Amino acid sequence: MKVAVVGATGMVGQVMLRVLEERNLPITELIPVASERSVGNKVKFKDKEFTIVSMDDAIAVKPEIAIFSAGGNTSLEFAPKFAEVGTVVIDNSSAWRMDPTKKLVVPEINANVLTKEDKIIANPNCSTIQLVMVLHPLNIKYDIKRVVVSTYQSVTGTGKAAVDQLNSEIKGENPEKVYPYQIFKNALPHCDVFSDDDYTKEEIKLMKEPKKIMGDDTFNLTATAVRVPVQGGHSESVNIEFENEFDLEEVRNILSETPGVTLQDDVKNNHYPMPLYSEGKDDVFVGRIRRDLSQPKTLNLWIVADNLRKGAATNAVQIAEYLVANNLV
């Protein structure tokens, strides 16, 4: 099977190649794609070197699957061109997520919605993925009424230039800024651009995407997204109000038995999720599970995941694996 990785030199693209190496997708030909300035350069994959090609050359090869991590404008322009030659596109950008004709997929939750007719499949936002991995099983059991989420997001979510800014500031240098302010020793309540209603695009994604993935628009959700000077992964403080009463031990049991979720909830031994220890892992980690003492039927918890892996690359590869396993490609 021929697989194109579009945006192969970016942070997510590099992790994508690593995840593809680790997993069992039956790749016979890898087609790395990047910007024109990178064409002709090499990337390593399974101890071999592959030459980066242009978008047009990749389309001409007619790969079975193309995984995009190259930004929304690139996806809007080129994903349909791949689809025209029969390629299934799995897109990491926000370009197609809320398009009513496109599926927004977290495989553990809703891969069953995919069909052979789906030629452009949207990969959700990184912070959305880890959130719905926890919300979905609890919604099935207790029926969610309202969610309040505050995020603490890694600079890796912005890209390599943001990581370089943080590392330079740690050294006491004065680098070119990706963010409007210093990120070292700071926290910026400003993930992505602000919309007319004063929410950021990141917050709007968090408020809209879960409902589409979970197939449930009956609950309300509000979000505040904050960029923090860490590199390991994204963290989320989540407050969930349910329609039905819950039992804390049952909540822990449900989450511990949810595929792709690891329970870390032993505060007596200082055992709880942290972004530093999520780095390089594919699971979503959940802990600090406790009742909200201010109102009934309400739960507080803390969710952490590697935003480059389950939040992006791993989820996309899992979609590809599902397509192959179910003869949808």
Residue ranges: model-predicted function:
Residues M1-I183, T218-N220, V284-F285, I289-Q295, ...:
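N-terminal Rossmann-like NAD(P) cofactor-binding subdomain of oxidoreductases
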Residues A66, V155-V329:
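Charged docking surfaces used in two-component/phosphorelay signaling
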